[in-house]
Amino acid sequence: MNHEYQIIAKSLSLTEKQVKDTIELLDEGFTIPFIARYRKERTGSLDEVQIAAISEQAEKMKELEKRKQTICKTIEAQEKLTPALKQKIEATWDAAELEDIYLPFKPKRRTKAQVARENGLEPLAQIILLQRERQPEQVANYYIKGNIKTAEEALSGAMDIIAEVISEDEIIRQKVRNVFKREAMITSKVVKSKQDEEEAQKFSDYFDFTEPLKRCCSHRLLAIRRGEKAGYLKVSIDVEEKQCTDQIQKKYIHGYGKCQQLVGEACIDAYKRLIKPSVETEFANSSKEAADKEAIHVFTENLRQLLLASPLGQKRVMAVDPGIRTGCKVVCLDEQGNLLHHSVIYTLGNKVQHDALADFRTLTQQYHIEAVAVGNGTASRETTDILRRLEGIPVYVVSEDGASIYSASENARKEFPQLDLTVRGAISIGRRLMDPLAELVKIDAKSIGVGQYQHDVNQTLLKQALDRTVESCVNQVGVNLNTASIHLLAYVSGLGMSLAKNIVEYRKEHGAFTSRNQLKHVSRLGDAASQQCAGFLRIPKAHNPLDNSAVHPERYPLVEAMAQEQHCAVSELIGSPDKLKKIELSRFVTSEVGMPTLNDILKELEKPGLDPRSQLEEFRFDERVHTIEDLSVGMELPGIVTNITNFGAFIDIGVHQDGLIHISQLADKFIKDPNEIVKLHEHVFVRVIEIDHKRQRIALSMRNQKK
């Protein structure tokens, strides 16, 4: 597999050893978070993104290897697999080139060329292709027999054979492919019979659209493909025909004459009928794959920022799911998110609002509420304005994305079988304020609403990427072994749903964990799983203080040696800058433990179990604006980032319609990625630059802001 290591290393700008060691660790069953955190010496301190890229490329290599074996078996069955051909196949690591090699041997439906061969026209095709015969029509007369009635039919059949030979020429296919790489244009046209339909207007920007394929960004390409799938657009990928046919004719035409003319016609036929449709499909697929990859990257970044959003922590919360006609669903939760109270409070009308405020105030006093969570759906702004009149209690607006999915789920029904799903939704909103990560892992990541075109991309790849992101975030934060739900534990490195259930069952039967060593008593949780999960599980007030840190149990002896050298207990070493400064890390370097791990341990001992998530901040919309009619160009307003795409960021400014900051308006400098400037749910200050009342669109800017 050495050659595969070289290819992966070169494509990712890594060393061959890094790739080899990482693949070995993955093959041994270690998870990406575990490898990134606890095997830095083996990988050369690769991060999770790099390890995931190696894993992805290694899987592609395995698939390519399987394809090679299938191709060799198929050609061998035809008794055409020569040693040279086998070596050529084995040396090829490009999927398109491999299929080009296989093309002449690939079983295919009965083609025009096969019919011509069955009619005995292959010798005539070879004569014409040699281009030495001056009178091919006369030679064609010798082939008039059976199904061939005229010399013209014989020549036509011979040209079909020549066209197929040309179309299976891997060098020619690569030349055409290179032209497409450089020059391909993507064109979309409206389907005339449907252009007046209301739904078609969503794609009006692409009714007559042309752009170089290599410059067509992912959101445009996905929008075009969505319009095509819906039946409103006709889409093609094309190049100037002459650029390709000239290259083909340059190789196959020698001199002048009737044979040369026939070969020239066969070249054009080969391109138009056989090569172009195949290469166009190939580029349609590869451009869609590239757009999917870019879009999935945007979705995973959005999800990561949602999962790692600032938690309120263990405080008593009143959560409100706003409603106008049906009233607000109100719940009160204790510090652990347990339900204390639920009711409905109506807020429509001045007198009702006065009564509602009194009801809200009573609940906050009765249940000692420390914070209020308001869902960001219908009537959110109006409800928030009422709740802000509560003295001394911060009010936070919380995204409702996915709350309705959770409230209707089997898990929610099991926990609250007697409650209406709207009440369950309000509970989810409150818990999301307390700990976004712990609550969001309960629902399918795709339900959270992570991107505009998430339903247009490859769903298998999207699920893999989102699941990997959830796993990464859960392990980055760490999990309280004694309070975590099954859903949260399931994403811990080495566990999964089955072992997570066993941990919860053990907790119910034996009470809280007091040591990581107790993991070995959990049913079916063996040494391998224990090794992978232990470092990511936290036990507050454990017998061993290291059990509430990210220090892995396999490194406890090392920390104990550090403490012994400082003449103190491990508990005295933790959080003591003076003692930690005195430790000479170089003295503890071994063949297995290098400076990367030692630095991580020291950092963890300084602040054990430090939550990497930022501090939660209260936010207020501008009191001057409540609807789009209140806006005017030039207004400067506070807002919250609600979604990030590769073309910009959507901002909630409190008018029931998000505004868009185009990527060109995000900064005073050129940027490639909006994530360089903004993060999901970040509080920003924006300027209104355009308002389209008819289409309900608001254009915003963050350029030229005063520092």
Residues covered by each model-derived region:
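Generic start-of-chain signal for non-secretory N-termini
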Residues: 1-20, 27
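Long, highly charged, low-complexity intrinsically disordered interaction regions
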Residues: 4, 62-80, 90, 405, ...
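Short, ordered loop/turn segments at secondary-structure junctions
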Residues: 38-40, 129, 240, 322, ...
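A glycine-rich phosphate-binding loop feature that marks nucleotide/adenosyl-phosphate handling sites
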Residues: 178-185, 320-324, 377-382, 398-405, ...
